[in-house]
Amino acid sequence: MGMRPTARMPKLTRRSRILILIALGVIALLLAGPRLIDAYVDWLWFGELGYRSVFSTVLVTRFVVFLIAGLLVGGIVFAGLAVAYRTRPVFVPSNDNDPVARYRALVLSRLRLVSVGVPVAIGLLAGIIAQSYWVRIQLFLHGGDFGIKDPQFGKDLGFYAFELPFYRLLLSYLFVAVFLAFVANLLAHYIFGGIRLSGRTGALSRSARIQLVTLVGLLVLLKAVAYWLDRYELLSHTRGGKPITGAGYTDINAVLPAKLILMAIALICAAAVFSAITMRDLRIPAIGLVLLLLSSLIVGAGWPLIVEQISVKPNAAQKESEYISRSITATRQAYGLTSDVVTYRNYTGDAQATAQQVADDRATTSNIRLLDPTIVSPAFTQFQQGKNFYYFPDQLSIDRYLDRNGALRDYVVAVRELNPDRLIDNQRDWINRHTVYTHGNGFIASPANTVRGIANDPNQNGGYPEFLVNVVGANGNVVSDGPAPLDQPRVYFGPVISNTSADYAIVGRNGADREYDYETSTETKNYTYTGLGGVPIGDWLSRSVFAAKFAERNFLFSNVIGSNSKILFNRDPARRVEAVAPWLTTDSSVYPAIVNKRLVWIIDGYTTLDNYPYSELTSLESATADSNEVAFNKLAPDKRVSYIRNSVKATVDAYDGTVTLYQQDEQDPVLKAWMQVFPGTVKPKSDISPELAEHLRYPEDLFKVQRMLLAKYHVNDPVTFFSTSDFWDVPLDPNPTASSYQPPYYIVAKNIAKNDNSSSYQLTSAMNRFKRDYLAAYISASSDPATYGRITVLTIPGQVNGPKLANNAITTDPAVSQDLGVIGRDNQNRIRWGNLLTLPVGQGGLLYVEPVYASPGASDAASSYPRLIRVAMMYNDKIGYGPTVRDALTGLFGPGAGAAATNIQPTEGGAPAASPPANAPAPAVTPGSAPPVAAPPVPDGSVTLSPAKAAVLQEIQAAIGAAKDAQKKGDFAGYGAALQRLDDAITKYNNTK
């Protein structure tokens, strides 16, 4: 019986077709329009930065990959459909109840749509997915050799880094394409009658059999290739219960042979499948496929499991020894922990120290950091904010400069940025928000070893940082009293100013100056941006594009935008670096520095791999998490790596946004590959100026990854490694408010790398014994230009108290707890413990230092800024405690120990001005034992004092005597009261006629 006539589809009128086309056009515009606008804006932005080649290279690469992958997958699927259609049976028996006949008629009526539309849709999807792998493809095209061969196959590591990922990608796409072609061919033959399921056995046409078995055979061949590549991936895979990343005993002696056996079986099965092309019997290929499946279960899974349970587990330490050695070597290479970088030295950790030995460690004791950058931000806000819209981040940064005497000091530094989210009332108006309040103003630095005066009570004047300020002053001139001269303190780019939903500012001269700049006693002064950065928006096309980009009609109608106007956007320094170098992973810490009289943000960039043979696979998020990262929500991306290099140092100019990339690691093959992909974008290391090199620091995230790996991979013996008996732990932060690991600390101290008493800027961390609270090691990474990147590990053999035990001993000391109880006034005042520093001093000793802060009231109100109230120390089992570093050192080691910490300058006046910042900050005092006040001149015999002045002088002398007596007795409350009496008496003396 023949087929029923096909029901005709109703024809569309011309008007209907036009309406459908318009609707499709609107939908396409809504879908593609925003992407086209973003692409055009990015083209403008990259061009303004001078990195348009990056944009064009990425765009062209993505497009070419999209095109090739789409054509490959879509073409194979189309071929499967086309061949099935061309070889369809001429006559297909059918009846009125045949459901396939309806589908056949529908497909034939829309043959072009189905035969072309389906492959195109699949090709588009495949291309969209494939273009996201442009990084892998560019590395394949430009990757080179590492100069290191893997220990199993003898291949250069460049094969694993650059070639193997591409081969895997290509194989995956071929497998998907052939599988989809098989499905399409199968359905086409079924619809067109090449496959019929009627009757007891059904029927299969010759052409259908040939095409389907050919596609199945190709799939089996691709599986054989996959088995071959699996061999290489064994060297970087992880398996439960295995102590290392990479191939272990079972992998090499069972899994690896199994892969070769399975590959051979797959080739035999492929031949069996292809045999069905000439033989009508399909039982042979079916048997072959079943054999392959059973072999994968028995040979691929069963045999390795038997070897693991019977041979390896009873003798695991010996069996895995060779492969653990491979992992130790590879992990050290991959994470920059080889012997030419890391130096191990024995260190007792509990040696006795004399006062003279401690005093001789001037580089350490004169630089003991009292300012905790996670605590003192409210003090910066209190004294240096100036206006409600200026802002300091909750966590400040640490950098180093030479002080006025040429000594290396570390400073707590911050940029006074504008925070658009703190604008209020009329300040939030679009014109004010984006054209008036456009920039921050000022670089603030506080010597980390210094506070202004001594506070024995949170309500007293003292205990706050000394502020060195670079700022536009009240007369419009740049006040440059900071640690280095600065020509332009205005800040248009930074992490705070960009942290808003509408991150842009419109600048440029259009009539009178309109950007808020500073205030005099009588008026507000405005400013006009003159930097090179910014995208011009003077023409109507640009205004229209940005109106669409930010969904803001004021771009079109506001008269504040003129022919010279420019727009600054994407102002976050780290995001700018990630945009121009999309192959970099940036450090979570961005810090400001003055370099050659310019204010710049410095960002560390990493190149990474996730398939370095035998190197441990590490999660950046978990490895870099510490109490600061958790508290301030600055966790690194959840990215797994087995190779990392701090290959790039980047700077972003805070005024004009210029991004500069410098090569830091000249040996990194990954960086070399990317420098070929994007030639001219990364400057050679030789272009790093000496001024910039002085502010480059060893990056925190890299150090945290390395210290976590050193906890295991400092072990040389594989048997000891397997037993974990000599492993270390990263200590938990002992602060009761913390909930994660103790962060590493930047300090200026004696030079651990050179093992001498010169001053060195370094990043340090204590390490505990495995699952214990005793110290195992002390790690220091040098940031000095001459020894940059050298890591020194002081291994500590005895039972030396770790950070938690030291903190417990300090906080529970009766004298400490009693004194802080008085200061806290039954929790009316808030006591906060600062960072617990671990400092090598003397000839083999370790000094713990923990500053204590107090703020009035128990709240976190901005006005309740913390003041340094005490300094607590511990050396061996002895506690030192006092208002100053010198007092605490003297309590520990005796008189003279704090000689280097007595650089006291007279403090004149009270607190620094809060708004605007003081143009000339008053001298500060490094806490010592002397009262932090300016003593009146002692009259000689030729000077006659008035009776009132003479009486006040006696009060001063009495207060000094009381302070000395209280200090000798260790009466800190009495000492503080005497200092307050002295302060009041001196003020009274100066005001007495």
UniProtKB/Swiss-Prot annotation:
Its main location: membrane. It holds the Pfam family UPF0182. The keyword Acyltransferase does not apply. It is a multi-pass membrane protein. The chain crosses the membrane at residues 18-38, 63-83, 113-133, 175-195, 210-230, 254-274, 287-307. Residues 903-941 are annotated as: Disordered. InterPro entries: UPF0182. This is UPF0182 protein MAP_3291c.
